Amino acid sequence: MKKKGGRKIFGFMVKEEKEENRGSVEFQVFSFTNKIRRLASHLELHKKDFSSERGLRRLLGKRQRLLAYLAKKNRVRYKKLISQLDIREK
């Protein structure tokens, strides 16, 4: 992981972020994964923050739906993405 501008950025996503790249399924899953990890670390400190917990569950659902779509459309890109993001497959 590299730090760039105070944010952690994975090496495979350092490519120039063009407008078309931001709409790709891979970029959206990457973005949701970063938000999920940030919220999970927040909830470790603030266990009774139920509104953030609800937001985390919504993000998990959105990411799960996007991953299901990608797995159905292009299995190779799906496998590559989950290995790079270090998330498990269901």
Curated annotation (Swiss-Prot):
Pfam family, one: Ribosomal_S15
Annotated gene: rps15-A
GO molecular function annotations of the record: structural constituent of ribosome
Family: Belongs to the universal ribosomal protein uS15 family.
Keyword tags: Chloroplast, Plastid, Ribonucleoprotein, Ribosomal protein
Self-association and partners: Part of the 30S ribosomal subunit.
Gene Ontology process terms (BP): translation
GO cellular component: chloroplast; ribonucleoprotein complex; ribosome
Transmembrane segments: none
SMART domains in the record: Ribosomal_S15
Subcellular location: Plastid, Chloroplast
Annotated CDD domains: Ribosomal_S15p_S13e
Annotated HAMAP family: Ribosomal_uS15_B (MF_01343_B)
PANTHER family documented for this protein: RIBOSOMAL PROTEIN S15, BACTERIAL AND ORGANELLAR, SMALL RIBOSOMAL SUBUNIT PROTEIN US15M
Name of this chain's protein: Small ribosomal subunit protein uS15c
InterPro entries: Ribosomal_uS15, Ribosomal_uS15_bac-type, uS15_NS1_RNA-bd_sf
